[in-house]
Design a protein with these regions (language model features):
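M16 family metallopeptidases and their MPP-like homologs
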Residues: 1-53, 59-112, 120, 125-133
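Proteolytic maturation boundary segments
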Residues: 112-120, 124-162
Length: 162
């Protein structure tokens, strides 16, 4: 929200965890102005570190997240394909048959402490792989200056250029 509402550098930004057997990738995205690519990455890094450090999620933030997840539930099962996908996911991930029916209550039952503990476990800023796309001539130097890790430049086919 900071990149969009406070800084006005992006139309939107978000994150999500992909369902997976084993490790679940945390995906974050923020299409930003080219001239703010490095500053935006720095801001995301700062926010992640704050959430697991000096500025944990507030009760209001957690309630907003839970309410959003609950409100999205009906739309997640609008089509037969979506229902079939949910049933398949239940099988794949070893979920009980009543997983969908109990999901709302389980979301609402999450305590602030449990959500914060999960955030602390999932958000590992030093383990992130950053993929920053943009005008190389304009963003390479400031992105490298962030020292987020080894910088590789890839071509349009994903081959390492340098």
């Amino acid at each position: 929200m900071n990149l969009r509402e406070d800084k006005k550098w992006a139309y939107g930004a978000g994150s999500f965890l992909r369902d997976a057997v084993g490790q679940r990738p945390l995906m974050m995205y923020a299409p930003v102005q080219t001239d703010k690519a490095a500053e935006s990455a720095a801001e995301i890094n700062k926010e992640l570190r704050a959430v697991i450090g000096a500025k944990p999620l507030t009760h209001a933030e957690i309630d907003k997240i839970k309410a959003s997840r609950v409100r999205a539930l009906p739309g997640s099962y609008e089509t037969t394909g979506a229902v079939l996908g949910a049933l398949s996911a239940n099988q794949l991930y070893g979920r009980p048959d009543d997983y969908v029916q109990t999901l709302k209550a389980r979301i609402e039952a999450q305590t602030d402490a449990a959500v914060q503990a999960a955030a602390t476990q999932v958000y590992r800023p030093d383990a992130l792989t950053w993929v920053i796309v943009g005008d190389l001539e304009r963003i390479e130097k400031p992105v490298r200056a962030l020292n987020l890790g080894t910088v590789q430049v890839l071509d349009a086919d994903g081959k390492v250029v340098r």
